Amino acid sequence: MSGGEVVCSGWLRKSPPEKKLKRYAWKRRWFVLRSGRLTGDPDVLEYYKNDHAKKPIRIIDLNLCQQVDAGLTFNKKEFENSYIFDINTIDRIFYLVADSEEEMNKWVRCICDICGFNPTEEDPVKPPGSSLQAPADLPLAINTAPPSTQADSSSATLPPPYQLINVPPHLETLGIQEDPQDYLLLINCQSKKPEPTRTHADSAKSTSSETDCNDNVPSHKNPASSQSKHGMNGFFQQQMIYDSPPSRAPSASVDSSLYNLPRSYSHDVLPKVSPSSTEADGELYVFNTPSGTSSVETQMRHVSISYDIPPTPGNTYQIPRTFPEGTLGQTSKLDTIPDIPPPRPPKPHPAHDRSPVETCSIPRTASDTDSSYCIPTAGMSPSRSNTISTVDLNKLRKDASSQDCYDIPRAFPSDRSSSLEGFHNHFKVKNVLTVGSVSSEELDENYVPMNPNSPPRQHSSSFTEPIQEANYVPMTPGTFDFSSFGMQVPPPAHMGFRSSPKTPPRRPVPVADCEPPPVDRNLKPDRKVKPAPLEIKPLPEWEELQAPVRSPITRSFARDSSRFPMSPRPDSVHSTTSSSDSHDSEENYVPMNPNLSSEDPNLFGSNSLDGGSSPMIKPKGDKQVEYLDLDLDSGKSTPPRKQKSSGSGSSVADERVDYVVVDQQKTLALKSTREAWTDGRQSTESETPAKSVK
């Protein structure tokens, strides 16, 4: 036994090496933990075959120990409810199994005391009481966030036209004092969600006012009284008046300050204009707002109510823009209920009731596709739009030459899926465009997609449904039902009633179906078949290397690198004792680096041979063999023989075999010449026996 104070001893089950965890048994060994603080010996952990053995199987140097983990789990039946801990050294990881949890904790505590390990901070599971608690001022920090973020979180479930800005009551004064221009307080306004039973015309009044903006709209200033009878920015005025919603402030008063707001386009709500008042007076929505209330003015400035509408030639009718319910109510006094929506605009006259002055063509040509209008349609969410292609615009001009024409809104780039849904319905009512106006000759009926997985091409026009070709044959015959092919096609006229249209044509048989099925030769009687070889699959590497893993109760202990620096690895690490039971015998360890044993003259020879300093140079003696490759092909040329460098500093790369191509004719000539020379030499020596042979 080695010296040192015995700190702990007991029975433990030891794991085999990491690469043999699945194939070798975990054997029970007697472990002894020794501390050399008093005697000066190293701190070691020894294990013996039994408790009365005198020679240890192996000695584990604890100076090389890096970490100790307690409470591991191993995916093996015999270790399901075991108490496993490991000792992680530089050379190997030792997994040890204790009989009880107290014994495991005792071993771990003793080893950590000797090695100076402390619990690491990388424990995956923390005590329930150690979870971070929210500070007392956390709700205050959350409430003092920008109101815009609170509004987004509170109104995330509402549709886009009803994005409300909700400010807590205790933050109203705080937000106004800090910066009242950062956000808009809609305290004096009320909004409500749209009813599910609203009609399409009523839903046209609840479009968002924050979709478009342009510099063509007049600024929100109080216009002069002389502007009340003139068109503004290409729009006609209207005699109807809409008032702003009532303010809850008691000091608000009614004033005659007006906001002249232009109107937007709409495909389903058109203004009703009498011929007598069309030329003299246009239509304009005038909003009467109190000038004494600064909050309403600030509100109206922040609400984006501008349009991307350039001036249009002629008397083009503009559809009035609608606002969400509650934002602008139909009231003339401030004490009226603000939840009443504005009145529905009058329906348009028939085409024959209007004067020729009211009719104008579409102000955008087919080439002006980049400067089309960008106006959201009322009654829909801003993500939907109405689109008319260039070909459809040309047809629209032909069909509506004597009818009313309207400015067509441009599609939003975010959504191109919806095309002319409401616009098509409106023109179908007005008899401007019929359902079958698009001729079927213009549709490509014979289109065959090259990609069999691609769906049939959808036409850009949505006036009519795409014509489904009954006899459409795709490129791949596997995806087509040939049984229904030609059933709707009548027979040719010259055939008469010889073939019934209900009789399907003969189904073509693919070439692959004509091949006979494979024959199983093993089904023949009295057939002698060799048994299939037994497949022994090697154990996968990941299964061999599978080791005990960490669990939620695993605790790790390691040395603090800042306080206890790692000592350098000693020269003699490996044990010289036998370990036949665990296959850890290392008595015959041979270093892989030959430089460690270069002083041995019996292995590699002297370094001074041939002036070389490398121990890998082979000694040049009588037994050095050179190989010659005899090539009997006379057509090949003989390459020059390389000279080996024998000076100082020759490397291992120079010690290689040179292969020489030998010519057959030259070899035979040399052989005959040498034989003739040898015969002549022997005859000469026989005549003069006194002459010594050189």
UniProtKB/Swiss-Prot annotation:
Asked whether the keyword Phosphoprotein is assigned, the reply is yes
**By its UniProt entry, which PROSITE patterns does this protein fall under?**
PH_DOMAIN
Q: Basic and acidic residues composition bias: which ranges?
A: 194-203, 672-684
Molecular function terms, GO-annotated: signaling adaptor activity
Q: Which CDD domains match?
A: PH_Gab1_Gab2
User: Where in the sequence does UniProt note compositional bias of the Polar residues kind?
Assistant: 145-157, 204-231, 362-386, 594-611, 685-694
User: Residues where Phosphothreonine occurs?
Assistant: T387, T638
* SMART domains in the record: PH (SM00233)
Biological process (GO), any one? signal transduction
Q: How does the annotation summarize its subunit structure?
A: Identified in a complex containing FRS2, GRB2, GAB1, PIK3R1 and SOS1. Forms a tripartite complex containing GAB1, METTL13 and SPRY2. Within the complex interacts with METTL13. Interacts with GRB2 and with other SH2-containing proteins. Interacts with phosphorylated LAT2. Interacts with PTPRJ. Interacts (phosphorylated) with PTPN11. Interacts with HCK.
* Protein family per UniProt: Belongs to the GAB family.
Q: What is this protein called?
A: GRB2-associated-binding protein 1
